[in-house]
Curated annotation (Swiss-Prot):
InterPro entries: RraA, RraA/RraA-like, RraA/RraA-like_sf
Residues noted as binding a divalent metal cation in the record, renumbered to the chain: 101
Lineage: Bacteria, Bacillati, Actinomycetota, Actinomycetes, Mycobacteriales
Name assigned to this protein: Putative 4-hydroxy-4-methyl-2-oxoglutarate aldolase
Subunit and interaction comment: Homotrimer.
Example GO BP: regulation of RNA metabolic process
Co-factor note (free text): Divalent metal cation.
Keywords: Lyase, Metal-binding
Cysteines joined through disulfide linkages: none
Organism of origin: Mycolicibacterium gilvum (strain PYR-GCK) (Mycobacterium gilvum (strain PYR-GCK))
Record family assignment: Belongs to the class II aldolase/RraA-like family.
EC code(s) of this entry: 4.1.3.17, 4.1.1.112
Domain of life the protein comes from: Bacteria
Catalytic activity: 4-hydroxy-4-methyl-2-oxoglutarate = 2 pyruvate; oxaloacetate + H(+) = pyruvate + CO2
Length: 160
């Protein structure tokens, strides 16, 4: 289901004080600064095999929210995995963790927000959980809800 991106500041103004706005100061890494879509989640720690598997599936304009427990010790996404997501129709990635290949990520037509960078590879054992409710930055990310992201931040709204 494709969702049209909307300015997060406008969403905050419309929703009011109960808005679900992520407090983490994430950085933009992808070539698309505005993105939106239904949420799919992955919880993993310094291991990206599961998220690579998810991005291998049709994204249908969705947003993959990855809770890497805030670790920047290893990168969960690099150019190969980001391109996999782009080519399979994902609109964006929100990563509570690190990425690598930052200069190449900027050239890809996919939104990518993450805490920072680290050139170190993650492990590939497949540890992790898919489609669990995850929480970071003061926001609960529930699969199926809608994430909106732009230069101002990330807002999550309940799907209608």
């Amino acid at each position: 289901m494709a969702v049209t991106p909307r300015p997060t500041a406008d969403l905050v103004d419309e929703i009011g004080p109960e808005v679900r706005s992520c407090d983490l100061q994430m950085r933009q890494f992808g070539g698309r600064s505005e993105f939106a879509g239904p949420i799919t989640t992955v919880r993993c720690f310094e291991d990206n095999a599961l998220l690579k598997s998810v991005l291998s599936e049709p994204g249908d304009g969705g947003v993959l929210v990855v809770d890497g427990d805030g670790s920047v010790h290893t990168a969960l996404v690099g150019d190969v995995i980001a391109e996999l997501g782009r080519s399979n129709g994902w609109s964006g990635l929100i990563i509570n963790g690190a990425v690598r290949d930052a200069s190449t990520l900027r050239t890809l037509d996919i939104g990518i927000k993450a805490l920072g960078t680290n050139p170190r590879k993650s492990s590939k054992t497949g540890d992790g959980v898919r489609d669990a409710v995850v929480e970071f930055g003061g926001v609960v990310f529930t699969p199926g809800d809608i994430a909106y992201s732009d230069d101002d931040g990330i807002v999550v709204v309940t799907a209608d």
